[in-house]
Swiss-Prot record:
The protein, known as: Uncharacterized protein y4dX
Residue segments, region Disordered: 17-73
Keywords: Plasmid
Chain intervals with Low complexity compositional bias: 30-41
Domain of life: Bacteria
Length: 192
């Protein structure tokens, strides 16, 4: 239904498709005015319409009878565009056949269809070992008997000011390194 006509170098053809009731299209060619008097290129415009075209001019560009409107280029330009598209397709193939990444992100859906939980799983062929040393959980209490037995206290030897700090629950987290209990004593520190 579209009329294609390109004449001369740099010629522009215009395709106009109009809505209709299935009537046979009427084709009309009109020469567009040149931009300057010295312009050597000739431009032709092809209009395909259903039904009546005004006698003295063209159908208005913003007529509600228009369905779509596009610009056609010189066939040489189209060949260059197709060659560029082929190059892009070849580049896409090269990128597609590259080596797969070491890590992949996978989704594992568990549960019924109305209650779905999503877990992110890292699919890494190597075992991932992460050992981070965490600080010991310190437990500060007044262990006056333990502090007095150490005999390392200096200064104020009153039992209410003697504090022993030891690590609390060294095996609480299985990922943490196993730490021996710390027994530290401080003297002269007032209790809060």
């Amino acid at each position: 239904m579209a009329a294609h006509l390109c004449r001369g170098r740099g010629a522009v053809g215009r395709r106009e498709m109009l809505r209709g009731s299935g009537k046979k299209p009427i084709q009309r060619l009109a020469k567009a005015p040149a931009a300057t008097a010295s312009s050597k290129t000739s431009e032709w415009r092809a209009t395909t319409a259903y039904g009546f075209l005004p006698a003295g001019g063209d159908v208005r560009p913003h007529s509600p009878r228009y369905e779509s409107q596009g610009v056609l280029s010189d066939p040489a330009d189209l060949g260059e565009r197709f060659a560029a598209r082929d190059e892009l397709a070849e580049e896409g193939k090269e990128e597609r056949f590259a080596e797969p990444p070491d890590r992949r992100l996978g989704l594992d859906v568990k549960g019924a269809a109305n209650d779905i939980g999503v877990e992110f799983i890292e699919d890494d062929p190597e075992a991932q070992v992460c050992i981070e040393a965490g600080p010991p959980l310190l437990d500060g209490r007044n262990f006056s008997r333990a502090a007095s037995l150490l005999g390392l206290l200096g200064g104020d030897r009153e039992k209410q000011n003697q504090v022993v700090i030891r690590s609390g629950k060294p095996h609480a987290d299985g990922d943490w390194p196993i730490l021996p209990p710390l027994y530290l004593s401080f003297s002269g520190l007032p209790r809060a």
